[in-house]
């Protein structure tokens, strides 16, 4: 890929994107490739719009349990922001007593749109929360109930239907090779939750993490369009299963001629016949009411 003209023919039926969150050029190129007929995994339009706090809000509405979570305004802003004009609708100071009463301690302070364990802090009391929040800079943050889990599971998901639950240790940030660590009831809860989230979010490639406490699986992190699927991370036997599942899914997408355009207004303008404006092309303009 190099200089990309606005009109180009698709060279591929399917592209699997695992880098555009770090290299913006790829994201821009993939959107245009999608217009040209390539099916991109994951959908670059939705990936650009998605973020973690929306995911928590969505999960609560589709019946997937999540920890109590509060979205927080940024602590600081770029110099061009005038607090008196641009921030006059923000509550200040924040109602920390009400926020912490709802979430409880300990809690996790993390970016509302982040990943890779960056800028994540565990806070045990209000002074620790203030210290971590004051250091968060211009990031919009979330404060989330900490689940003191009995088990922790990360599901690698491909094509919305293939779901591979693997025991995970978030303290050491590594997978654990274990068998039969979930009861049938817990396994069903995890698989059903991951399935619902993948379908609701529209992800063809994702990882969904659950913290399990007292028989309840809480979805902790599930908006991961480029999940860690490296052979050194997920263990060779799991890596083989995931690669095979992704290969089968990519071939299926290519054969079916899938599109990323479903639900987007521009789709109808890429088809024939195209919609026509009122007056059947004779021209129209907005006029003030009399």
Model-derived features: positions:
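ATP-binding N-terminal substructure of ATP-dependent carboxylate-amine bond-forming enzymes
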Residues: 1-41, 45-50, 54, 78
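Short secondary-structure boundary/hinge segments and terminal tails
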Residues: 5-8, 51, 76-78, 117-118, ...
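Glycine-rich phosphate/pyrophosphate-binding beta-alpha loops
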Residues: 20-21, 223-239
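Phosphate-binding core of ATP-grasp and ATP-grasp-like enzymes
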Residues: 136-140, 146-177, 191-207, 211-218, ...
């Amino acid at each position: 890929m190099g200089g990309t003209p606005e009109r180009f023919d698709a060279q591929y039926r399917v592209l699997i994107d695992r880098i555009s969150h770090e290299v913006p050029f790829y994201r821009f190129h993939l959107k245009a490739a999608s217009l040209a007929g390539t099916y991109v995994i994951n959908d670059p339009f939705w990936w650009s719009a998605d973020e973690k706090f929306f995911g928590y809000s969505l999960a609560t509405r589709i019946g997937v349990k999540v920890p109590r979570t509060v979205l927080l305004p940024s602590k600081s802003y770029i110099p061009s922001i005038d607090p008196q004009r641009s921030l006059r609708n923000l509550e200040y100071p924040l109602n920390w007593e009400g926020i912490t009463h709802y979430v409880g301690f300990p809690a996790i302070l993390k970016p509302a749109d982040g990943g890779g364990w960056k800028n994540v802090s565990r806070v045990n009391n209000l002074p620790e929360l203030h210290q971590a929040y004051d250091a968060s800079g211009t990031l919009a943050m979330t404060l989330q109930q900490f689940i003191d889990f009995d088990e922790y599971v990360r599901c690698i998901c491909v094509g919305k239907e293939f779901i591979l639950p693997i025991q995970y240790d978030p303290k050491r940030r590594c997978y654990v090779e274990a068998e039969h660590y979930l009861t049938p009831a817990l396994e069903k809860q995890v698989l059903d939750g991951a399935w619902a989230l993948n379908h609701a979010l529209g992800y063809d490639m994702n990882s969904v993490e659950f913290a399990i406490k007292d028989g309840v699986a809480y979805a902790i992190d599930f908006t991961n369009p480029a999940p860690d699927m490296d052979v050194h991370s997920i263990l060779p036997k799991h890596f083989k299963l995931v690669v095979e599942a992704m290969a089968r899914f990519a071939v299926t997408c290519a054969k079916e001629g899938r599109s990323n355009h479903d639900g987007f207004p521009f789709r109808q303008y890429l088809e024939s016949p195209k919609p026509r404006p009122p007056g059947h092309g004779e021209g129209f303009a907005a006029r003030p009411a009399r």
